[in-house]
């Protein structure tokens, strides 16, 4: 079962007050409900592929309204042959839709969220919970990117959901998709806040555990990569230094170097694997710091490059013995 499915399953077990149940129902029906007319009856079908969600919608309707409710199961014939669960109302539909602020007399469907319906903080939470159950999704925190979204067919309703989420400072944004609109979150911290808002405590804790472990692994990897890069840089520098010193040795001899450069050159080619700090401690003329050793080695690099470019030892400042 996916992380999103586990989250929704957790939400279907929540106990809520009657007022919050109405708000949750309103969000779900607005997004997943369909109205049809037959023999002067207004029939409402609320559809989902999630059995636990279907049971919750059925139970909430049954607890709130004394009307006959049907729970039907259909099987998809295309693509994934999943079951489709339909909660159907054949009587009292108009009154229920008006009570849920989805329908206004005589028969006008509202396009946004009734502000009075979500005045209380708990009602705001309930509406977002219903919207997420209806058409929400959230990436597994172990995947490469964090993403939570709620899909809506209608732009006005999508904007209302975004505004409702941002009343909780979630930094939600909207985006148009091929068949509708989404309100989405990309920040891990905001996703955990949203899960807390809708009451998905277990999902929140799992998300945070995985996120912390993932961030720790990323930090370790960055540290290892940094240390590896530094090691490679050190090795490459040592190889270059030794090559340059050997070039000086083969062309003019180390004896042509000033004493302070001659000693470090001899130590470097005799101790290829030691660090700059260790080289500094080997000098017979007195210990020299890492920066001091590095400065001398850079001077040797410059001498080698100038000799390679065709300059004479005298031009470089070297004295060649005639003996």
From Swiss-Prot:
GO biological process, one term: regulation of sporulation
Gene3D superfamilies documented for this protein: Homing endonucleases (3.10.28.10)
Keywords of the record: Cell cycle, Cell division, DNA-binding
Name assigned to this protein: Probable cell division protein WhiA
DNA-binding region(s) from the entry: 275-309
Record organism: Listeria monocytogenes serotype 4b (strain CLIP80459)
Top-level taxon: Bacteria
Name of the gene encoding the protein in the UniProt record: whiA
A Pfam family recorded for this sequence: HTH_WhiA
Function field: Involved in cell division and chromosome segregation.
Presence of keyword Cell division: yes
